[in-house]
């Protein structure tokens, strides 16, 4: 039997964009009340449409959500799930046409795609292809792997193209897998990586798309859950030995119907 590939198959779904903004409160407060009201109404209508997403019964959710950031790293976070990069770019351009946009200063962004790593399935698929006498890397091998992943793709559509959870709080952070001299995630056998990945969350992949390898979005109605979850992750091998974490961004959901409360400083 030929040596099986150590690269697991992956499935990709929604393209995801995080936009982090500072808000120019000084300029905003100088506006007359009627102008602020009009700008707020315009943005609320846009956000409501984005929140609703795709209303077609067989379409992907393709939703957006707004969050009020806690701390000095920014004021607002917009997250968008869309089918393509072009759709994400249209969202950016649509926001830029609003009367609110001059008051927004984008300080950061993060681009990724929902990714499911098929660690366990990959081993089975590779073994089945090898039993058929196929050689890794050949057109026949690639076609067989493609057919197998296509079947899995259909069964995992709701995870690949998720709706944004209705939870009140969001914790977002990027992360890498270490490649140092002492530990290197990518040199571990695929079977070992599969075992360790059973302890991880479903994350978005950003290799070749942004500065980190993955982005993680956690949603909860109790922010202490984030602390407990990340604390527990420090004890699983994937995170404790192989993970390198970026900045953490914690924020509170702002629905379109409540956007006036945010502008007025009365968000509950």
Predicted regions and their residues:
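Short S/T/G/P-rich N-terminal loop/turn motif that feeds into the first structured element of a domain
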Residues: 1-52, 83-87, 112-192, 221, ...
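Short, glycine- and small/hydrophobic-rich beta-strand elements in well-ordered beta-sheets
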Residues: 5, 47-74, 101-116, 192-215, ...
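Short, well-ordered beta-strand segments in beta-rich or mixed alpha/beta enzyme
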Residues: 19, 69-84, 170-175, 210-233
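A short acidic (Asp/Glu
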Residues: 76, 89-91, 120
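Secondary-structure boundary elements
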Residues: 84-87, 98-101, 195
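Short amphipathic alpha-helices in soluble, non-transmembrane regions
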Residues: 90-97, 228-234
